[in-house]
Amino acid sequence: MKPSVILYKALPDDLLQRLQEHFTVHQVANLSPQTVEQNAAIFAEAEGLLGSNENVDAALLEKMPKLRATSTISVGYDNFDVDALTARKILLMHTPTVLTETVADTLMALVLSTARRVVEVAERVKAGEWTASIGPDWYGTDVHHKTLGIVGMGRIGMALAQRAHFGFNMPILYNARRHHKEAEERFNARYCDLDTLLQESDFVCLILPLTDETHHLFGAEQFAKMKSSAIFINAGRGPVVDENALIAALQKGEIHAAGLDVFEQEPLSVDSPLLSMANVVAVPHIGSATYETRYGMAACAVDNLIDALQGKVEKNCVNPHVAD
């Protein structure tokens, strides 16, 4: 008899078929308490869980006594109670490598669109404001040869540094938990403390996961240390930034502009002051949102769940020690 798994995110037909070759698959719309209650027997028997954008906490795990592995279609896993999973010896799988290049593309797009005011001036053209040769009120700022500060030199940070160094001749500063020898050798990147990075960078790109340590890591104090001409980019996790402090910094002119793919609350409220600022490019968490990459992430997540329930945790496992 095939193991039972719960799928709470739609998959392309071929990937669903692959999952069904290995498991009895039960599809649900979400992991809300109502859904769990209505499908209590299915949740009680499930050995695997696959999906994204839902919280997996201790309360849910209490309803799933046979769960052995959960696989998220994402690199981030801050919506999972890792301690609760680990305590129950439940494997957590994620997709850390598939989306690296695509997210780095998104970061570079935010750098370019904020610096050159692409969204703002495009809207002005559509509004009929381009009636003569443009003047300084349409100008942006250069990207090439400007200093890029990267906070979080992981896979995505490295991919961004590659684009910035080779494509735009940008000096690279970085701050991370440890020195990154490859970044320093390949991109001539310079490690520095966070204060130095904030003070010297023309673009500050935040690429950090959300943890207890990183929550509101960026607040009023950090924005006050940045150049008034600096542009802030966030494509990590929204709550790493105190959004009210960011809004205040933009309103006071402490920083020049912001390009944001993530927010403290998602979807972003239509009442957010960020949406009324011409110098803010706000996009709806599109970091990995291309057809190719989202398919690759889903395929990786399917393979991860198959591997996990077969006891293979050599890659893409957050807590492999629980399999010992």
Curated annotation (Swiss-Prot):
InterPro entries named among the record's database cross-references: D-isomer_2-hydroxyacid_DH, D-isomer_2_OHA_DH_cat_dom, D-isomer_DH_CS, D-isomer_DH_NAD-bd, Glyo/OHPyrv_Rdtase_B, NAD(P)-bd_dom_sf
Enzymatic reactions: glycolate + NADP(+) = glyoxylate + NADPH + H(+); (R)-glycerate + NAD(+) = 3-hydroxypyruvate + NADH + H(+); (R)-glycerate + NADP(+) = 3-hydroxypyruvate + NADPH + H(+)
GO cellular component entries: cytosol; plasma membrane
Catalytic-site annotation from UniProt: R237, E266, H285
Gene Ontology MF terms: glyoxylate reductase (NADPH) activity; hydroxypyruvate reductase (NADH) activity; hydroxypyruvate reductase (NADPH) activity; NAD binding
Keyword list, A-Z: Cytoplasm, NAD, NADP, Oxidoreductase
Cell compartments where the protein resides: Cytoplasm
EC number: 1.1.1.79, 1.1.1.81
Annotated family: Belongs to the D-isomer specific 2-hydroxyacid dehydrogenase family. GhrB subfamily.
Oligomer and partners: Homodimer.
Function description: Catalyzes the NADPH-dependent reduction of glyoxylate and hydroxypyruvate into glycolate and glycerate, respectively.
Protein name, as recorded: Glyoxylate/hydroxypyruvate reductase B
Organism: Escherichia coli (strain ATCC 8739 / DSM 1576 / NBRC 3972 / NCIMB 8545 / WDCM 00012 / Crooks)
Organism ancestry: Bacteria, Pseudomonadati, Pseudomonadota, Gammaproteobacteria, Enterobacterales
Gene name linked to the record: ghrB
